[in-house]
């Protein structure tokens, strides 16, 4: 995307079939575009800046936004055809099975007048851009216009309720296992769950060098459509995760009533992670189980299910989809949709004697947009908590800091109220008995019942997708698991949260923002710190008995600094070894750890994880696995040497920072990549703070990056307002060949951030173009 002089003439709405009949009441506004394509949107009121946000999102992400709309409508096959391997058809069937389009319209009606004004203003901005710039809307996307308020609520529901929640709770893998072998296969399922999660730190004044609260927010998600691993039809559906950074300023530009900055998902009419001059917040994925699968027992006709000793009829409806054909015609396809009292039926067994129904939280909470605008406008912790107490967001931890020196943590979302005798082991990673009414949750906890902490004694809160119990150490009583039902969350602390908590708790002097940034950018592999010593001892001993490969591996690992810095040698060998070990744990060749394995399987440790020593355990390798651990090390040495020319290859020789551009209505991947730079940063299981998710491409002989460290905000709340810096690794645009896909990479590569522009004078000085809307 380049800003092209911006035609001022308003073209007739009929050019693209747009209607202004339901336009929101707004005033003229102005967008100041900075050099990184961040829109600084000025207007007199909320509807005006929201209209500008819709306009700006189209300017930066028109193809991605309209693709997201098409999918959330359940009509992508109608617009784009069946897709590779029938992807679009299957996706639309899923959206319709979930009932997203109809419920999205209900949310519009139920959400109240304020929310409707925001939704309509955003749509007006989207449609205004399309009307002004018809040549910038690809022919294959024009039929999707105009965008209407229910498109925004359907996108919200599709992304949060029906994508985030099921993926976090491992629903897709569980369904696949059940279809292959029923409940026994589910119980045997060896899970490899990576927390598509984040880092969030709130640092109180006592730990801050300037005596001001500091907030570090760092969501870890796929890099939207700017990542390289999907080569057709955006089949990975990563566009739903694409951030856009924006600055919304209301009132007098020099003394605004609101000056809010941050990011939102494409299609979002609010700031989802961000800050104003008084406070800020970030989110991390929490260990909440609120997307549950229930096994239904069907009668002989397959049309009724057993519930509480009585057979109830499955609700049956049909939906007719249009599927675009290569010759331009449309083929109609009818699908059957079934619902039980639990939720939509998502799978049947082959004999149609059993089925799975999926129940997700938050479907009766229509006012997410209102909640986030209340959060954005808050100036104090009580105001912010009052806004969040609406619990319209079914998910996420919240980490918060403010100008008054407060820090706050909330285990947020819609937490089901379950029978008191259930434990986390009973409800996580399983299929519930759909015949038992006691297991069907109908209520969720109130805000006051959720784990939370305000200004804990350690003067920090830190969450990296760990359960709430270890988010503040020393542990305050409000985060003591003994005070909550045992089914809320398991007890564990993986290596990345240990890394962050150790950094914050071990600081011997108050931290500057520069020191916080250094900690946030750490590529140290905490996993390696715990196990490499035992591995070297094992390999050295084997070398003395003639295993020259083990001896060579030991030499590399001994010299390694345990980081994933681009110039560090040894990390790729350790990575290859660990991946083989995890595969052997899954295959039963290596005995598994049971103390700290919620996200990813671990081999048995010599010292297991302990809640009494949460940031120093687990450690070591259990000797019972030594033989296979050594086999895997020899294999890893051979594999690494074959793949990269040397087993001592540096991290950046094996791993590259890769961003791409896409073309066409369905956003086909374009070669060559826009970037191919030596990377610093490892995958989550290894325990770095700076996470980058790798994907090995054999044809390239390297790992490419597809997610992880995306948005970063580091904000200090001074008496004069918020000051700090931000970064969006994969850029603030996704339009074909946009220069703003890669223009923030120099910051990412150098592990720095760009300044957050917080005053009108700074915005004016940095503006490369100015646009009225």
Stretches with model-predicted labels:
Residues 39, 43, 48-96, 279-330, ...:
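Gly/Pro-rich active-site capping loops and adjacent beta-alpha segments
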Residues 115-227, 235, 391, 403-420, ...:
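Acidic, low-complexity N-terminal propeptides/linkers enriched in Ser/Thr/Asp/Gly that mediate export
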Residues 269, 354, 393-507, 581-585, ...:
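Hydrophobic alpha-helical segments
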Residues 8-19:
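Bacterial N-terminal signal peptides
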Residues 25-239, 245-256, 260-270:
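Substrate-recognition/specificity elements adjacent to catalytic centers across diverse enzyme folds
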Residues 300, 365-396, 403-404, 480-534:
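Proteins synthesized as precursors that undergo proteolytic processing into mature forms
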Residues 1-5:
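N-terminal secretory signal peptides that target proteins for export/translocation
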Residues 248-258, 263, 274-432:
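Glycine- and hydrophobic-rich flexible loops that cap the catalytic core of alpha/beta enzyme folds
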């Amino acid at each position: 995307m380049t800003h092209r002089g911006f035609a001022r003439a308003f073209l007739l709405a009929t050019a693209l079939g747009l209607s202004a009949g339901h336009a929101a009441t707004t005033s003229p506004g102005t967008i100041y575009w900075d050099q990184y394509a961040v829109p600084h949107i000025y207007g007199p009121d909320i509807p005006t800046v929201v209209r500008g946000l819709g306009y700006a999102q189209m300017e930066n992400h028109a193809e991605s936004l309209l693709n997201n709309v098409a999918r959330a409508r359940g009509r992508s096959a109608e617009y784009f055809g069946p897709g590779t391997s029938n992807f679009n058809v299957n996706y639309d069937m899923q959206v319709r099975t979930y009932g997203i389009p109809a419920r999205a319209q209900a949310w519009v009606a139920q959400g109240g007048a304020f929310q409707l004004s925001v939704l309509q203003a955003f749509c007006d901005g989207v449609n205004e851009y399309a009307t002004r710039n018809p040549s910038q809307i690809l022919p294959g996307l024009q039929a999707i216009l105009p965008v209407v308020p229910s498109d925004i609520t359907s996108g919200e529901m599709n992304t949060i309720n029906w994508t985030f929640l099921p993926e976090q709770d491992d629903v897709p893998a569980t369904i696949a296992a059940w279809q292959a072998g029923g409940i026994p296969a589910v119980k045997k399922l060896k899970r490899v769950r990576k927390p598509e999660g984040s880092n969030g730190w709130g640092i109180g004044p006592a730990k801050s060098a300037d005596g001001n609260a500091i907030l570090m927010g760092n969501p870890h998600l796929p890099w939207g459509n700017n990542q390289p691993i999907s080569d057709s039809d955006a089949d990975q559906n990563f566009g739903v995760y694409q951030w856009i950074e924006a600055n919304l300023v209301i009132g007098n530009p020099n003394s605004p009533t609101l000056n809010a900055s941050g990011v939102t998902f494409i299609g979002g009419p609010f700031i989802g992670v961000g800050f104003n001059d008084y406070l800020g917040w970030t989110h991390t994925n929490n260990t909440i189980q609120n997307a549950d699968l229930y096994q239904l027992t069907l009668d002989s006709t397959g049309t009724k299910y057993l519930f509480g000793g009585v057979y109830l009829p499955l609700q049956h409806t049909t939906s007719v989809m249009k599927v675009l054909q290569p010759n331009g015609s449309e083929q109609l396809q009818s699908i059957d949709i079934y619902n039980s009292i639990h939720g939509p039926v998502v799978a049947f067994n082959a004999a149609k004697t059993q089925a799975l129904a999926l129940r997700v939280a938050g479907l009766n909470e229509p006012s997410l947009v209102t909640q986030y605008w209340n959060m954005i406008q808050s100036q104090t912790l009580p105001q912010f908590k009052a806004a969040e107490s609406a619990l319209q967001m079914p998910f996420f931890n919240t980490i918060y800091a403010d100008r008054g020196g407060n820090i706050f943590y909330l285990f947020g979302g819609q937490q089901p109220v379950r029978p008191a005798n259930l434990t986390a082991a009973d409800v996580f990673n399983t299929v519930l008995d759909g015949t038992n009414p006691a297991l069907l949750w109908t209520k969720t906890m109130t805000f006051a019942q959720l784990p939370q902490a305000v200004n804990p004694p350690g003067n920090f809160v830190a969450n990296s997708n760990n359960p709430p119990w270890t988010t503040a150490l020393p542990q305050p009583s409000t985060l003591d698991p003994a005070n909550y039902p045992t089914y809320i969350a398991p007890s564990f602390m993986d290596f990345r949260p240990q890394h962050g908590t150790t950094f914050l708790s071990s600081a011997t002097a108050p931290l500057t923002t520069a020191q916080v940034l250094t900690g946030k950018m750490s590529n140290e592999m905490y996993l390696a710190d715990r196990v490499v010593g035992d591995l070297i001892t094992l390999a050295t001993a084997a070398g003395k008995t003639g295993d020259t490969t083990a001896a060579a591996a030991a030499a590399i690992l001994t010299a390694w600094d345990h980081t994933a810095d681009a110039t560090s040698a040894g990390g790729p060998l350790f990575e290859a070894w660990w991946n083989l070990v995890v595969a052997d744990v899954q295959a039963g060749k290596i005995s598994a750890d049971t103390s700290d394995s919620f996200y990813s399987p671990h081999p048995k440790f010599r010292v297991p994880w302990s809640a009494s020593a949460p940031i120093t355990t687990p450690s070591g390798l259990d000797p019972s696995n030594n033989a296979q651990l050594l086999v895997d090390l020899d294999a890893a040495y051979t594999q690494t040497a074959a793949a990269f020319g040397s087993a001592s290859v540096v991290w950046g020789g094996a791993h590259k920072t890769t961003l791409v551009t896409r073309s066409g209505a369905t956003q086909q991947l374009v070669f060559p990549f826009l970037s191919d730079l030596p990377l610093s940063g490892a995958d989550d299981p290894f325990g770095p703070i700076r996470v980058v998710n790798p994907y090995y491409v054999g044809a390239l002989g390297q790992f490419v990056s597809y997610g992880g460290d995306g948005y970063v905000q580091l904000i200090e709340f001074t008496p004069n307002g918020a000051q700090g810096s931000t970064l969006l690794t994969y850029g603030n645009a996704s339009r074909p060949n946009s220069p703003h896909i890669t223009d923030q990479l120099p910051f990412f590569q150098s592990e720095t951030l760009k300044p957050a522009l917080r005053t009108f004078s700074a915005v004016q000085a940095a503006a490369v173009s100015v646009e009225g809307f």
